[in-house]
Amino acid sequence: MLPSRRKAAQLPWEDGRARLLPGGLRRKCSIFHLFIAFLLLVFFSLLWLQLSCSGDMAQVTRGQGQETSGPPRACPPEPPPEHWEEDESWGPHRLAVLVPFRERFEELLVFVPHMHRFLSRKRIQHHIYVLNQVDHFRFNRAALINVGFLESSNSTDYIAMHDVDLLPLNEELDYGFPEAGPFHVASPELHPLYHYKTYVGGILLLSKQHYQLCNGMSNRFWGWGREDDEFYRRIKGAGLQLFRPSGITTGYQTFRHLHDPAWRKRDQKRIAAQKQEQFKVDREGGLNTVKYRVDSRTALSIGGAPCTVLNVMLDCDKTATPWCIFG
């Protein structure tokens, strides 16, 4: 990590018809020989398919159906070891990239390979966790990040809260361990859309210790927006210093923003009391109160980049937050 790249925030995410049988077949081959060859082909094809499916299913864990609330639970199995495990030049720290997600598959196909290459060039040990919300409630980015924190393995010691539609382009951006305090990679001076001083969204790095100190994020924010503003107040309330990049000269060209609002509109509705509640600090809820279950955990490779997809069912207290329901 280069100290010069961080500053404290100043305040007030052969032939196409290839032969099917070894050695080919003569034109005058008997029907009996053709039949035997066909049976052999079917047998070996089924054998290959069985072995292939067995290998894939070994990567999928299903049936984790019991509801989970808060952190008093053992961490899930480790992700597959990456190539840097025995290379000390990658450093001692390992990053869990937490990606809240719903239905943006075209963005995910770009994000995972890009981030894996970007972090690998910077020699950052990492694993990408895609937190796919599969329930019927409105999208809850903050609760998904809480789930990602709890479900990421013990081998990671810091997290990146990372939007799937925000890609870093400048190689000088620092994704190293944020020992001094939370590090806001997508600072207001660099983010292509959001420029207010208290903004901490897009991409934010925290040590797991500091995230616990904040009690994670509030689970009350259903729909798009405002959860980051509440988390900023949690950071300050925990007595943590927020840091941002310094010496980056690419301005608003520092990131590529994938989201197309004309194609995929955001859920920005404010229903009933949500209009007032969105500006309050949730002093009781957070990491310790998130309720969910993981329906499945799948190890994938997208464009050669490894990641883990968790299908997450969030739970909503409709009395406390009736705005979790569409309409």
UniProtKB/Swiss-Prot annotation:
Residue ranges of the TM segments: 31-51
GO biological process: carbohydrate metabolic process; glycosaminoglycan biosynthetic process; negative regulation of fibroblast proliferation; protein N-linked glycosylation; proteoglycan metabolic process; supramolecular fiber organization
Example of a GO MF term: xylosylprotein 4-beta-galactosyltransferase activity
Topology within the bilayer: Single-pass type II membrane protein
Recorded GO CC terms: Golgi apparatus; Golgi cisterna membrane; membrane
UniProt cofactor(s): Mn(2+)
Binding-site residues for UDP-alpha-D-galactose, renumbered to this chain: 100-104, 139-141, 164-165, 194, 224, 257-259, 266
Tagged with keyword Ion transport: no
Keywords: Glycoprotein, Glycosyltransferase, Golgi apparatus, Manganese, Membrane, Metal-binding, Signal-anchor, Transferase, Transmembrane, Transmembrane helix
Cited InterPro entries: Galactosyl_T, Galactosyl_T_C, Galactosyl_T_N, Nucleotide-diphossugar_trans
Subcellular location: Golgi apparatus, Golgi stack membrane
Topological domain ranges for the Lumenal compartment: 52-327
Pathway membership, UniProt: Protein modification; protein glycosylation
Residues that hold N-acetyl-D-glucosamine according to the record: R226, E227, D228, D229
Region (Disordered): 61-88
Catalytic activity: 3-O-(beta-D-xylosyl)-L-seryl-[protein] + UDP-alpha-D-galactose = 3-O-(beta-D-galactosyl-(1->4)-beta-D-xylosyl)-L-seryl-[protein] + UDP + H(+)
Record carries keyword Membrane: yes
Residues binding Mn(2+), per UniProt: D165, H257
Cytoplasmic face residues: 1-30
Main localization, broad class: Golgi
EC number of this enzyme: 2.4.1.-, 2.4.1.133
Positions bearing carbohydrate: N154
Family: Belongs to the glycosyltransferase 7 family.
Role this protein plays: Required for the biosynthesis of the tetrasaccharide linkage region of proteoglycans, especially for small proteoglycans in skin fibroblasts.
Xref: PANTHER family: BETA-1,4-GALACTOSYLTRANSFERASE, BETA-1,4-GALACTOSYLTRANSFERASE 7
Official protein name in the record: Beta-1,4-galactosyltransferase 7
Species whose genome carries this gene: Mus musculus (Mouse)
Gene responsible for this protein: B4galt7
